[in-house]
Amino acid sequence: MLEATPLTEGWILRHEQGPLAAVVPGCVHTDLLAAGLIPDPFLGRNEAEVAWVGRREWTYEVDLPGVDAADGHDRTDLVFDGLDTAAEIRLDGRLLGSVRNMHRSYRFDITGMSGRLSVRFASAYAEAEAVRERLGDRPNAYPEPFQYIRKMACSFGWDWGPTLVTAGIWRPVRLERWSTARIARVRPLVTVDGTTGHVELLVDVERAAGETGLRLEARVGGVGAVAEVEGTSGVVRLEVPGVELWWPRGYGEQPLYQVELTLHSEGDVLDLWRRRVGFRSVELDRSADEHGTGFTLVVNGERLFARGVNWIPDDVFPSRITPGRYRARLTRAAEAGVDLVRIWGGGIYESEDFYDVCDELGLLVWQDFPFACAAYPEEQPLRGEVEAEARENVVRLMPHPSLVLWNGNNENLWGFRDWGWEERLAGESWGEGYYLGLLPRVVAESDPTRPYTAGSPWSGSWERHPNDPAHGTHHSWDVWNREDYAEYRANVPRFVAEFGWQAPPAYATLRRALPGEVLAPDSPGMLHHQKAEDGNGKLARGLARHFALPEADFDRWHYLTQVNQARAIAAGIEHWRSHWPVCAGTIVWQLNDCWPVTSWAAIDGDGREKPLYHELRRLYADRLLTLQVRDEGLVLAAVNQAGEAWDPAGVRLRRMSVQGVVVAEVTVSVSAAARTVAGVRVPHEVEPVEAKEFLVADGDGLRAVYFPVPDREVPYPQPEFDVEVGPGSVTVSARTLVRDLLLQADRLGTAARADTGLVTLLPGERVTIGVRGWEDVPGVEDVRRALYCVEPAR
């Protein structure tokens, strides 16, 4: 039987100042940080102080005693699941191999060898710049050479991330001892026909020597099957009756079946492969219709409006991301109503831990191939690396039922057409051959049960603009970059794969990241932790359209920018959800951060939720009431993504003044069948017509609020409310209109979390906000100082 021994102990890292203890899996930066040799690059402006690390060579070493004994096995292999990135591997001075791809695993036969194992990493900068020198400079979105090396692109910085180019053994390394043969690769093709599941295991084996007879045995769901190995391959087919379907979150359960495959020779078990699978079908409906070209995910025959978030690496040093951290982040996503996570193409092919959690939670996964915002050369050595990594990772991730879509790249097709690349490239390769040739071929050959799309955004044809909202996927970035979020209403894309609005992280996150700094939007540390081009300018212009800008009041600025972020995303999602099935999904940019930064994230780099996160819980709930401005006037839309019809017992519409007076009131009926949207025209008598008026819609425990003018024009009363504090709660009772009340619980204790975000209270209403994590129950005045709401323009 194959024996695997992890190599986690005894590693040292050699560098200019001598050896130091190393953690494997890990990376250079985290080892230097643990040794006290560099400051924390996440704090202050330390990022610049550690830039030298990416320009150096680094060597990891460990002794491998007794490898030559081999413990009676025919073979001993040294296996690396991930090396970041360009490295030479030597054992006892002998070169085992040279590698240059973070996204691949590597295996070396070291039978009969022992001694000092050395992994010497070249500077990723030096490697990338050498390739650029050889192949020629090509355009990208950031002035770094990230497209010339198969490494996580955002290591080189992004408009939300630091430039921290590291190196290291970033995924597990082990010794594998085996005899006769081992299971080298398994491609599980899992399909379902009614309630009958089909599992086809296409198996490759590696032989140590000879042509010994080999047999494969597989079991799943109480069903077994056997097949002989012919040469170095075999196929095992199983038919499993009465299977339960795996469904996305909110549509059904997520039953998982364990597949166990064993390799036998003359009665001995040589190797074991074990994975969990789920039985479900997935299609991507890209049919043409009167609105353009659709982009609708269909799972088990059910058409979905995808309630999505974009995912970036959760740490700029991915080796630090634990299984528990993956589970915490993804659980928070599921609790916010998310049912689809897009893994963005400037990061990595995500880990088994990530996908296991998605399988269990029913989170659909859209996996980008790692290409983003650049013209990628198709010449060697890069082309061979791209094909090898794609084939390996497609097969690695195939077992996971959560994986429903492969996407060729992020914004590169758009960049070629719109960002001046075509002229600059002048006929040089830029990645089109990957996205329209190599990658779809790899997916078709290896994973034919899943759809592939060439890129995001992509309209499906060069005959149309790549980012045409009427065809395929659309990235909506005119809003934020140039326009107000009210402009989301200008079109109805078929699928919105990116849109977003920035806000700073939680106050406690800022205080940890910028210790001792007098905080201001333009203070040195705040500017350093704002990576977007003209980011603060866009924040200011976005605020000015809606609010009177606070002067020299950082706390108000912090609150209002977070409110504006939540409102912007709400404007988009409510509009687009109300247009289902023409629009079939929204993927918010972005769920998470990789460090403390002002960004588009809903959960900041320290794991604290912004108000946007709590707003997503409302926006992505199965049922949503929304008031929408249409050509014919104001419309009340009932969005019902639940599996049962929704017939609220009358929706109460109140036209109110900001002083709390009900000017007019009616009750309307609206009924939405399962998975549909229904709308009703708001009667004229309850439409607000003055700046001092607004409309409230209440039905079935849900509320929608509509103000006809920006906040800066609304004559709000001075907010008045009473506060009660309990052991784990804060209750606020409104005496006036209180708009967008927010408890910033982290101001009361760095571990404190509130379970509620922005709440609008009418006079006489109250809300109880649950709080966990504070050490001592604070006083009422302390809580008042942590409560914020919209105030009259000053």
Model-flagged regions — what are they?
Residues 133-140, 357-364, 378-391, 421-429, ...:
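Aromatic- and acidic-residue-enriched segments that line the glycan-binding/catalytic groove
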Residues 376-464, 567, 607:
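Active-site neighborhood of glycoside hydrolase catalytic domains
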Residues 15, 168, 406, 441-444, ...:
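Substrate-binding clefts and catalytic carboxylate motifs of secreted carbohydrate-active enzymes
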Residues 86-87, 126-127, 285, 313-316, ...:
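Flexible loop/turn segments at secondary-structure boundaries
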